[in-house]
Amino acid sequence: MSYYIPYVIERTGRGERSYDIYSRLLKDRIIMLSGEINDAVASSIVAQLLFLEAEDPDKDIYLYINSPGGVITSGMSIYDTMNYIKPDVSTICIGQAASMGAFLLSSGTKGKRYALPHARIMIHQPLGGAQGQATDIEIQAKEILRLKKILNEILAENTGQSVKKIAKDTERDFFMSSEEAKEYGLIDQVLEKSAR
């Protein structure tokens, strides 16, 4: 199913200019991460983060997240870029932040991680599958366990929880309300009104 991307028209003293809504939001340093996180989505998010840093390295960037998660390596490219650039990255969950979406939500600048009142946040261990020869399956299993360890350590750092607690809580899907995610340390505040 396809959907229409709205255009907005700005009127200035020099005339009119139309933008697709996402380009217009980018002018206000807002990036939308919606849907499954894959290489194409990650490349777009990374490019926007780098562009906004080049525009003004001292102004915050706002990353709005409504995502069921996705590919770990794609999400890690966004995570690494968020940490690489100079501007603070404020994360805001709208709708849901699950799996890698929740990981990125928790990875915003401390004190600037938010969720709307009815958002849902879910953390769990990495998912994967392997096929082929026994040796290939063993290689894939070792890699997913390595990624699980890295993700658990980063989530522990982001939330203030112990790695042991993160490992236990992510053993299965662990859903939270916005308030519960705040208590857990995934976010800093539940927003009733815009923080901007």
Swiss-Prot record:
<keyword id="KW-0645">Protease</keyword>
<feature type="active site" description="Nucleophile">
    <location>
        <position position="99"/>
    </location>
</feature>
<dbReference type="InterPro" id="IPR029045">
    <property type="entry name" value="ClpP/crotonase-like_dom_sf"/>
</dbReference>
<comment type="function">
    <text>Cleaves peptides in various proteins in a process that requires ATP hydrolysis. Has a chymotrypsin-like activity. Plays a major role in the degradation of misfolded proteins.</text>
</comment>
<protein>
    <recommendedName>
        <fullName>ATP-dependent Clp protease proteolytic subunit</fullName>
        <ecNumber>3.4.21.92</ecNumber>
    </recommendedName>
</protein>
<dbReference type="GO" id="GO:0004176">
    <property type="term" value="F:ATP-dependent peptidase activity"/>
</dbReference>
<comment type="similarity">
    <text>Belongs to the peptidase S14 family.</text>
</comment>
<keyword id="KW-0378">Hydrolase</keyword>
<dbReference type="GO" id="GO:0006515">
    <property type="term" value="P:protein quality control for misfolded or incompletely synthesized proteins"/>
</dbReference>
<keyword id="KW-0963">Cytoplasm</keyword>
<dbReference type="GO" id="GO:0005737">
    <property type="term" value="C:cytoplasm"/>
</dbReference>
<dbReference type="InterPro" id="IPR023562">
    <property type="entry name" value="ClpP/TepA"/>
</dbReference>
<dbReference type="InterPro" id="IPR001907">
    <property type="entry name" value="ClpP"/>
</dbReference>
<dbReference type="GO" id="GO:0051117">
    <property type="term" value="F:ATPase binding"/>
</dbReference>
<dbReference type="GO" id="GO:0009368">
    <property type="term" value="C:endopeptidase Clp complex"/>
</dbReference>
<dbReference type="InterPro" id="IPR033135">
    <property type="entry name" value="ClpP_His_AS"/>
</dbReference>
<feature type="active site">
    <location>
        <position position="124"/>
    </location>
</feature>
<keyword id="KW-0720">Serine protease</keyword>
<dbReference type="InterPro" id="IPR018215">
    <property type="entry name" value="ClpP_Ser_AS"/>
</dbReference>
<comment type="subunit">
    <text>Fourteen ClpP subunits assemble into 2 heptameric rings which stack back to back to give a disk-like structure with a central cavity, resembling the structure of eukaryotic proteasomes.</text>
</comment>
<dbReference type="Pfam" id="PF00574">
    <property type="entry name" value="CLP_protease"/>
</dbReference>
<dbReference type="GO" id="GO:0004252">
    <property type="term" value="F:serine-type endopeptidase activity"/>
</dbReference>
